[in-house]
Every structure is written in structure tokens, then in C-alpha cells.
């Protein structure tokens, strides 16, 4: 099976939507759409006319239901009035918010072209949406659905009596299907309700069940072939009595679908799946929550949503076999009623196409659907929005034929031309009839009567809808005008054609024609009338022609109405006449109206797009602001984290209690301290050098000799000149010494600032060194004292009495100098102590005194050290891997012990895991012969 897809060019299409319902009208002229959802929910009624591919909004009387989607709609006609033109469309449930509706609304469509809303007041039940419904024996049968307000899915069957307006729950048996919503339902043989697919909030389904509406027993269907994917929101349409079409939906992987599957119902329990292939390039987009309607051999797919797109397009599907011949012929529905074609009973239509036993009685394709009638018409040029029945077209053809016959008869009677034979077909209608006398003397009166009746018929038809509106809607603008009765023939005067269409009816005087008109009119069909043959010059010829007409009428009575219409059109050559008389002004006006409508529609669409763009830009700006705030928050959080980490490191660095810390952190802290001390030492070397230079500049104590409780400088006596020079030098030294303390103080202040940055350990080391130096100096002084004592005791005898006075005076001076020096030293020691006390205040207990840059340097050095350690470890691992690979390569082909080279290796050494030794050799070894590591354990291998 193949499917030919075409996209329909629409006129005045409604807003795109999904979740709506589409109800096929019983006369096959189109379908009605109610409700749906897009940016908002709808409650309007839209009518689509298949004859001119146009949409029109229906204004109904009464209180309309509230906006909704996900509801159900069912066509119902009372069994008490099976031949009535009125019917009802019953709507139940649906939702506009999370809470679904539970009301029932009925749209009454009467034969007088009126639409009336009525809300049925019943006991409240739980509302639901996404359910399905059918009508069986004056009961509305509802199955499934969901209630988002209560987070509940249903698998119960509810019955609503259309007579008593009461709800009740039907108890069912058999294999009951699981609870679900957005499934599909269809009826077979009017007593079986099938369901397919659906969704229960967690799982998608592709199973089939049917409920016997007489026994209320569920049964699961096992179909052959490859079933469709699990889905919901699809559509199911009966295209024949034994064929079901599944289209679209949303799959289990949240992907929208546009595939088609056909379920063949071949018997009571025989079912088979088939997936046809697409033809053409206008394949419908993937969608769900759309509608499909089967009318006149075609399936109409309308609206839906999918992949973020809201759709309002319309596609038609035609079914072909492998030889590209139609499986379901395109039929023409001809309603007999004179009322609006939206109204019509399914029993009051005649199929004028190829007979199809499997086609639905409500199917219809319109005159434009037949390939042999008005093949040059284009659906995009249909501007009329009123639906048209083909009975008016047939009556227009009949009246034009009868008018032509009367005019030809009058001309032949006046000219007495017996050789002119007109093979015209006489048609009759149920409005008016005329009798022609058989005498030639009354020809003029008959002609006058015919003209009068034609004018009366014209006035009568003008009050009705234009019967030739289908022809006027086509691109060829076919129209007929029969007002000018003085013209010789419609065929000979194409210039008399205009956009005004009228019809007249005549008939010859015969008793059989009157009876046939009455009988056929009562049945509501289009009778077949025999053609008129012969001359109208005398009574005998008229009698012969009447007898021939009666015989031909009996022979052609079985012909279909479509063949008669086609023969009449061919005999009139109406295509050529209409093509010669195109009214360009009307065409231009219609084209202008069409373009104006399209421009208005595009402007509205553009405005809606601009509004959407504005909203989108506003949302984008809001999102950008939110993203910026989130980024700022993330930056703040990251900074807080870094600050907390630095605090932790700081607390670890300056924490005195390190007993609770792990060994790794202690090692890291030790490395950090060592590196910081090294850096500080490098920075403080100039200050230590300055201290050493100052200590060198301080004069050392002169070596003295204690003798008889007096101190004597170990110097040789100098001559007087030398003494004077020495005194001058001493005075200069004293001046320098007086200046030195000031310089020392200044230098000490500088050193205090510099030494304030030294660490505690370094200062302790300096103090220790100073103490050691002092001890060494004291030891040296004591040694010198001892040596001087010995020297003085040995040389005391040599000293003379003259020099004693000199030495005493000199000793006093030196003692005074020593006292002064000692006082200066004590002052210096006090200053050093004060300096040490100040240093103790500025000692580096931790790294508090370090600035930000020094901390960053320490941290970078720490990270660099970690990187170096990691690189060293990686290098070791790589070296180890290389060595292991080499060992593997060496031992790859080795099948014997490394030591004895005779036994196979069956021991694995641990921890090196070398397996190149046998058990005998391994028992004698303590180290691995390959890697020289100690053997801690051995594992034997059993082969």
C-alpha cells in the first residue's frame, strides 16, 4: 500500500492549536473543529469546507462552553428521527488548567441552519481529560483519561444516558486494559469499541483491546505483523469497514512521530499490521494531539504540535495500491435537502463516484474531487465560504438543458425544418412542468408559455443559494445565463454568458413524464430522462418522438446520475464556452480579495511573531541577569572557599598544638618553615654582616696585669716624645669613642628595625655565638693574666725605684680609663639587653608579620615543591614500569627456571611478583635474582 500526501492551501485558516476535536459532518461536506490549546485555550467553532478549501467560524446561540482542550466530541442522531436533517455533537470533559472539567455540552445542529448550545445539568463526577468516547444505543460510553489535579489515571468505563441525563459506572469483565490517557478509540460494526496505545504517566503503550458493547467484556487483540511503536497523542481513523489508520503521536523516547500504520481487520479474530510507504514531497511533519477525518475517500490531517512547533496546516492522504491505482475511490456526496449543506443526515446522500461497498455512508469528496469534472479548477481560488451540495449543480445542468431544448424546439417549429434532428437530453425537476400541444398551430403559444415559465423559474431559483457557485469558484469562472430567451442557442452565443446563474425547467406533454417526476421527486433522487429525437412539424412526428422518448427512458433508467451529467456537459461543450468568456474584472477582484486576506493573515502572523520575539527577548534579558547573579554568587563562594582554605593553612601554620595533626601535614609544615627560614636568612645576611662589623669596631679591653692590687698594662715604657704622641692618640681615641656611642645608637635603631624581621631560631643562634665568644674571651684573659703574673714576678726584681713613681701614675691613669671603658661596656650591655627585650617583642612566633606577597611566595614554593615531588614520583613509577616491561620482554620467551634452566617456573615472589624460579631453586634464595629485592612471601602456581 502507498499513500499520496498533499498539503492543502487554506483560505482564512484559524489559529494553530493542539488538543482539539474534529467531527466529520454527516453529509460529507467537511468537518467541525472545537476547542484546542496554543498560548491560550479556545472555545470557538470552526468549519472546514472540503469543496472550496475554506474555513469559516460558526456563531452558535446560547452559552458556549468554557475554553478547553483534551475533551471528547461525538456525533449523535436520535433513532426516533432517523430521516431528520438535525443532529447533535456531544462534548465531554477536557481541561484548561490542572483541574479537568466534568460537564457535558451539546451542540444542536437543526435543519434550519441554526446552531444552539445547551449545557446538561447532571450529578457531578470526577472530571477527566485525554479520554475517549463513543455512542452506543443512546448512551455515551467514556473510557480512560487522567486527572492531573489528583495525579490519577483511569481505566474505568462510564455511561451517560442521553435520555435520562444520568451517569453510571459500567462493570466490565475479561482482560481489562491498564489505566491510560491520550489513547485512541474506534468502533467496528457499531458494537465493538477498540482502543490503541496511550500513556499512564510512566509508560507508553502499543497494545490493542476491544470492548464488546453488548456483553461488556474486554478482550486483548493479538495482531500479526510489526506493530507500531508505543505512543500517545496519536489519531485512529476507520478508512474502510475493515481498515484502520494510525498516524503520528509521541513515542516512548519522547520523539514525535509521523509514520502511518494500517490495521487490517480480516475476520472476527484475525488482525494484521501493515506500514505503507509515502509518495510525494509534502509529507506531514511529526506531531501529536492532532485530528484526522475521513471524508470522500481522503483522510484530512489538521493541526497538532511537535518538536516545539505549533501547527495549523492541513494535509490530505489518498490510498493507492502497488500499481498506483486508488484503493479507496474518491466519491461525490450529493445531499438532497435544500437546506444548508452543513446540515444533513447520513442517509440522505447519494454516492456519485465509483461504487465502494467498504466506504462509509457519510463519506464525500465534493465535485472538485472527481477527476473528470472541472479538472482545471484550483483549490486555492475558491473564495466562497458556504458549503455547496452537488444537487444544485445537477439542477442547473438540467435547467440549462431544458432551456436549450425549448429554444431549439421553438426555432424548428417556426421554420418548419423537418431535417433538423436534435439529440438533446430532457431532464426534469420537481418544481414546475409544462405541456406542449401536438398541433402545429399552437407552437407560438407554447413558446410563449415556455418563456414565461422560464422567467418564473429564474425568479424562484434566485431566492435560493447559487446552484452554479462551484463553477463560479473555479479558475475558468464558468457561469450560465438563460434570461435572454430570444437567443437562438447557448452554444452559439458564448457572449451572453455572465456571472449570474439561473435555471429553467421544461418538459414535453406526456403522462409518463408527470408520473416519473412525482415518483422521483418523492424519493429525492435525480431521475434519468430520455433524449429528444425527431421533428416537431406535425402530430405524427410528435407521437413518434414521444414513443421513442418512452423507450429510451426505459433503457437509460439504470444509468447513474453522474453519467447523465457528464454526457450533458459533453453535448453542451460547456468547458469551451466557459473558457471563451472569462470575466477579468471579477477574477481580479477575487484575486485582490484573496491577496488582501492573505496579507491580513500574514500581518496578524507577523504581529504575533513580533510579540513572541519581544517576550523571548525579555526572557533572554531576565536569563542573562540571572546568569550574571549566579556567576557573581559563584565567584563569592569560590572566594569564600579560598579564604577558608587560607585560614585553615594559616591556623595550621601558627598552631602550637600539632599533636592532633597527621604526619603528612606536619611534614608539609616543616618543609614550609625550612624554606621560609632559608629565604629569610638570605634576606638578613647584610644585617648580620653589619653586626659583625660593629662588634669589630668596638675596642677590645687592653690586657692588664694585676700586681699588689693594681692593674698594669702590659706595655714597654716609652720615651717622652713617644709618650706625648701616645697621649695625643689617646685623646683622639677618646673623642672618637665619645662619637662612637651616638653612631652606635643610630646604627642600633636601624638594626632594631632590621632585626625585628629575624626569626626566633636565628636570634637564639646569634645569642649562643655571642655567649661562646664571651667565654672564649674570658678564658683568654685569664690565661694572659696568669702569664703576666709570672712575667711580673720574674721581672719585678729588675725594676728600679725611679721608675716606680712613673708606673704608679701611669697605672692610675690607665685604671681610670679602664673604669670609664668598663662603664661604657656596662652601658653597652644594658643597651644590648634593652635591644634584646625589644627583639623578644618582635620575635617571629609564626608568619603573622609576613605580608601578602611573602605568603604568596611561600605558597607558590609549597606548590612547586609538591609538583617536584609528584614529578619525581611519576619519574620513579615510569622507570619502574620501564624496568618491568624490560623484564617482561626478557621473560616472555622463557619457559624454564632462571637458575637451573631445567625446571619450569612455578613460584611467584612477593612483593616483586617475579615468576621466573622453580620451587627447588626458590627454597635456597633470600633475594630475587632479577630485582635483588628481599623475598617476603612465595606463591606456588599449579599448571
From Swiss-Prot:
Keywords, sorted A to Z: Coiled coil, Cytoplasm, Kelch repeat, Metal-binding, Repeat, Zinc, Zinc-finger
CDD domains: mRING-HC-C3HC5_CGRF1
Molecular function as annotated in GO: zinc ion binding
Comp. bias intervals (Low complexity): 369-527, 536-553
Annotated InterPro entries: Beta-prop_ATRN-MKLN-like, Kelch-typ_b-propeller, Kelch_1, Znf_RING, Znf_RING/FYVE/PHD
Coiled coil ranges: 593-653, 743-845, 872-896
Gene3D superfamilies in alphabetical order: Kelch-type beta propeller, Zinc/RING finger domain, C3HC4 (zinc finger)
Subcellular localization: Cytoplasm
Region spans: Disordered: 354-558
Protein name: RING finger protein B
